Each structure stands twice: as C-alpha cells, then as structure tokens.
Curated annotation (Swiss-Prot):
GO terms for biological process: cell division; regulation of cytokinesis. Residues 480-490 have a biased composition (Polar residues). The gene is atxn10. May play a role in the regulation of cytokinesis. Residues 265-293, 405-426, 461-490 are annotated as: Disordered. This is Ataxin-10 homolog. SUPFAM superfamilies: ARM repeat. Pfam families: Atx10homo_assoc.
Amino acid sequence: MKVNSTTEIIKSLLECLSKEISNGEDEDTMITDITELFNLSKEFDVRKEISNKHNEFLNILMNYIIKSTTANGDNNEKLFKFNLTSIRFLRNLCANVSENQNIIISNSNFINFIINQLINENNNIKITLNKKNILTSLYQLLINGIVLNDKTQSLLWSNIYPNNLIILIEKYKDNDEFKLLPTNLMLIYNCILNSKDRMKDLVCNKRLVQLIIELIKEDDTFDHEYNTQNFHWIHLISKSLFINDLFIDLYKSLSDNKYSTELVKSTTESTTESTTTESTDSTTDSTTTTTTGKTNKNQVKLLNLLDSIIHDGDKKNIKEYIEKDSIIDLKTCYFMIDELASLYNLDFARKDLKVETQQLTTSLNQSDFDAIFFFIKIFANITSYTEEMLSLSLSIFKPNQIPTKQQEGEEDPVNQILNDPFSKDSAIDPSASKKFDLNTLLRKKGLVAICIGSLHGNYGSDTNKSSSSSSSSSSSTTTDGETVTSKGFNKNIESQDKGFKIELIRILGNLSYKNRGNQDEIRELGGIEIILNHCRFDVNNPYIKEWSVFAIRNLCEDNVENQNLIESLKVKGVANNDELKDLGLEVGVTENGTIKFKNVPKKEKENNQ
C-alpha cells in the first residue's frame, strides 16, 4: 500500500514541478507532497523502491531545487520551505541505499549547486534558523551520499579537494555562527575513510592539514561543546592517517619550512670544524642567530594526538610485531628518534659559545621543548610492552640472554640499516623486526644514549646547582659500534611538566626489562649512577623515587656486572643502603673486608609498566 501511495504522491508532485509558473495553490500542494515523501523516506523499503522505479523523478527534483533557488533566492518563503524539505528527503534516501547515493552524487550540477551554496552563503544576511537548517541539511546530504560508497566518495572528493575544502574551513574557522565546522570535518573523515589515496591527498596539501590541526583549541572554555565536536572529528581523521602509516608525512607537511635533516647535519659538521685552528666567529654567528627552532605548535598538537591515542586508546603495539592494538610502525619509531637526535644536535651546536651565553640562550623554541616531551612520553608507552609483545620478545628474540659478539669483520645487520642517520626517510630493512625485538632496535638506534644524555643535563632536583652541569655533554659509543653524541637540553622542561625526568627513567627501566644488551649499555653510558641518585624522595618530583627503584631492579635482574657496580658504589658511599633494600638488594662487608652482595625479601611489583 505504501508503495502505491508513494507512486501517487510522486505523480502529483511531478505535475506541479512540470508547470513553468506555479501559483500559491500549487506551492501548497508541492509542500504537502514533499512532506509526505519525506516522512515515508524514513523507511528502508520506501527508499529502496524509489531507487528502483523513480530515478528520473530524483533528477527532476534536483534540477527544480537549483532552478527555483537561482530564480527566487530566499524571497519566496513557500519555495524555501519546499526546497529545505526536498533536501532532507534526498538526504534520507541516501541512507543505506547505494543506488540513491549514486544517482544524487553523480548529478554534477546538483553537487556544484550545493558547494556554491555552502561557499557563497552571504554572511551579511541576518542569520535565521531556516538558513542554518538548510546549510546543515546540505552538509548532511553530502555525508549521507558518500557513507560506505567508494564511488560517490571519489566523485565528491574530486569536486571539493583541495580548494573548496580550504575555502569552507577558512570561511567558518574564525566566525562559525552556524556551527558548521564539525559537520565539515565529518565530511572530510567520510571522504578519506578506507581510501589511502585520498588520505595521501589530504596529507600532501600543507594548507589543508594546517587548517584542520589549527582547529584544535588550547583553550576551549568559550564554547566547550563546539570545540569538543571539532576535536572529536580531528581525532578520528588523525587516527585514520596514523593507522595508514602517514604520521611521518603529516608531521612533515605541518613543518614551517621544507622538511630536511640536512640542517642538523650541517650544524654538527660546523661544530666539528670549529675545533680547528681557524676562527670560529662564523660558526658562533650561525648558532646564535638560530632562534626560531625546528618545531611549531601544529606539530606539537599532532604529537599530543598521537600520544593520547597510544596511551588512552591502549595502542602500544608496533605493527611489524603485532598488528592488533597498534597505531604506528617501526619506521615511525625510528623517525621519532631521529627527530629527538636532531633537536639535541641543533642545541649541541652551541657548545662553542661561552658557558654564560649557553645558559641564557637556546637554538630551540618552546614548541621544540614541547615536542621533546611528547616524543619521550610516546617512547615511555611503547617501550612498556603489552603482554603479547613481551611474550613474543622472550619466546622469539630472547633478549634476556647474554648477546653473542659478531664474528670478526661481520657487520651488525641493524648497523647496515642505521649507519647513515641522514639517509632519506631513514629507510628500514623489513627484516629488522624479524631479527630483534623492538626495545633492542630502539637501543641500537640511540634511544638509550638520548635518555641518559638528558638525565646528565640540567634536569631534576639539582638543577639550581652550579651552572657547569647545564653545559655537560657526553659522547659515547654504543655496544653496537654506533657513535652517539648526546647532551642535556638547556631548557628545563620540568617547569612545564615535572614528569619529564620520570618518563626518561621509565624508558630506561622498560628497555632494561629482561634485555641483557640494553642493561649493559645503560651501565656503560653511566645510567646506573644517575638513576641511583634519584632513588630518594624528591619533594619537587614525588614519584621519581618509585620509577628509579623500578629501573634499578630491572637493570640488576640476572646481570652480575650491574650488581657489582652497585656494590662498588655502596662502598664509595654513592648508593643508599635503605634504597637498595627496597630493590631487594643488600650490600655489606665481611670480616675480611670483602664486599658481600645478597638478595633480601622485597615487595612484589610489576616488572614492566
């Protein structure tokens, strides 16, 4: 019965639409008919029947909307009401019926009409509820027309990317009285969903990605609900890009300058050259004028998004090892270490300045320091293995066993991958993840040296001591033959978040858990001594003691060399015996003067957090 009534209503409506000039009575009939169709379209069977029998009617209706709007604008209230209801009717027809989606989105004249309406809406016209409703309905029609339909997604994307999308965001980003930006972001999300090509299109357009990330407001107290809606869709867009291995491209696209690591390489070279007998004036000038840093606020926002997805979404696995519950791959991990190292080197290039000048200046900006903090937080989470990652690591890679030395003349296969940190995109051998567990690869890439270098810098409860510590640096060779230059950053990141040093120690604790190679390198780079120095209560950083105890316990597990080092530090008065007991360790001296090292009962805690 409903199908018959639908057919009769459409027939009646077509008679009115076919008249070149309509009178008031015709307009009333049209409104009645389209309202009935709108109500009927809420049922799937009706939507399906219309797609099978009334294709031509849909095209006639769309053409009428274009013609009447162009001729009358908003002056005819009845036609305006008819058009609004027609748009809502078309919107409903698209729900779960791909045939209707194809008919509507394939009508290029109608799609261009919608886009022009959204872009050219006169902001000088008094805002009315009707105007808001019709613009919102147009957006909803576009979204319903592309949901789960790759064909219509491609058609619409070709019409709106990139210029129209940029115009739409720029139009409303500073004055969105209609609250349309969240719907705009929803449209972008549905366009790129399940299409890596369209995701790449989005990421490659620098202006577009900047506009999207800029919509994340640091202070959303003015309109919390509106900003929350924007953030929700930006979060979903970003997550889709991360899952499809586009974090690196997105991060580079957000850069203020042409992205390259050559800047870091050249500053390192100039620093080396300054040790010669030639004048260092030019080197000094180049470093002191580098005040703009490397990172910007949009990149920091992106890192914050990645950190929240990994931490709050519990996406700590790495794709090459376990794809389930993963958001990034090994290449992204390496890229983030390269970014950390480049920021270190950028600031380290100032070593030829006077100590007093180093204390008062920096080559890094505030966003650089914020980026450092988020990189460290991310590594603190991904080095904390999930149960699946831990089981895989111990059963396949066995990092808890004493590493065997490479045969003489045989190069470490990972060094073959990592020996040129300035190679384009730090190309990664896919087989690396089949030879070593994640935490071993991160150590070989230099993460241990970076963390210990930071702890040797000017952070922590003793940051107000002699300024000589602020210029301290260390150049060490890892157990894998790589030379890593590291230096503590000049700026005290703990002024923003006292958890920075905790995250560094947490990383070292995670890396050393049941991993003999990592345990040894931390000892060789002086990490044990500095971690022991934090095994005491710090009123300015109350949880650092617990994390330091956690790290020392993991460092000493099945590692006699590390245990012996702590014994020797106890004799020198460096280690606190009470703190060692918290670790389940006790150091004493026998009657003949030899050191006695034994285990004592300790509280059970999780080994890897």
